[in-house]
């Protein structure tokens, strides 16, 4: 069990099943998918394909998506790394999950999670030109988080940038 605050009793609920025929010896094969709630027909899925969700990176070191209408960037870094798109730059010193909301305006928020529950400090360096012309650093301290290990922390970027 990774969550020590919930019941130890098994809980079940249908989520979804996804399968791919990878062939016998796939090498460096790639694919991408998004999970969209509430889509129950091929017609609705065809409409969603024209959606504002963009897959910007899908590698063994990071997965980055952006919802252009909602102004949300979601980023999973599997190790230390840097993502750049246009003038936006995000660097992390270790594995983490990030979400940047409203990155185009003064109400921007940064959410940081440590899904590996390492209870360490994660350093995030940001350059978001719409908010500030300077690169800024966020130190997110997950040490001593105990039963809340893995929970995300939120930062108002106007207070940092």
Give the predicted meaning of each segment.
Residues 1-17, 83-91, 123:
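Trp/Gly-enriched beta-strand surface patches
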Residues 36-161:
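Non-catalytic terminal regions with compositionally biased, polar/charged low complexity
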Residues 6-8, 21, 53:
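Short, flexible coil/linker segments at or flanking structured domains
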Residues 27-29, 106:
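Short, well-ordered loop/turn elements at secondary-structure boundaries
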Residues 13-27:
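Exposed beta-sheet edge/beta-hairpin loop segments within beta-rich domains
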């Amino acid at each position: 069990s990774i969550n020590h605050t919930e019941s130890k009793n098994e809980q079940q609920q249908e989520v979804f099943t996804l399968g791919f025929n990878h062939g016998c010896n796939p090498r460096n094969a790639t694919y991408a998918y998004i999970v969209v709630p509430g889509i129950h027909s091929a017609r609705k899925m065809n409409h969603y394909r024209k959606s504002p969700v963009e897959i910007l990176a899908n590698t063994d070191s990071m997965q980055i998506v952006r919802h252009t209408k909602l102004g949300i960037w979601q980023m999973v870094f599997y190790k230390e790394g840097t993502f750049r798109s246009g003038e936006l730059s995000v660097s992390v010193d270790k594995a983490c999950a990030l979400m940047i909301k409203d990155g185009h305006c003064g109400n921007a928020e940064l959410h940081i999670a440590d899904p590996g529950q390492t209870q360490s400090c994660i350093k995030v360096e940001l350059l978001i030109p719409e908010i500030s012309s300077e690169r800024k650093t966020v130190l997110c301290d997950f040490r001593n988080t105990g039963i809340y290990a893995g929970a995300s922390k939120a930062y108002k970027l106007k207070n940092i940038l």
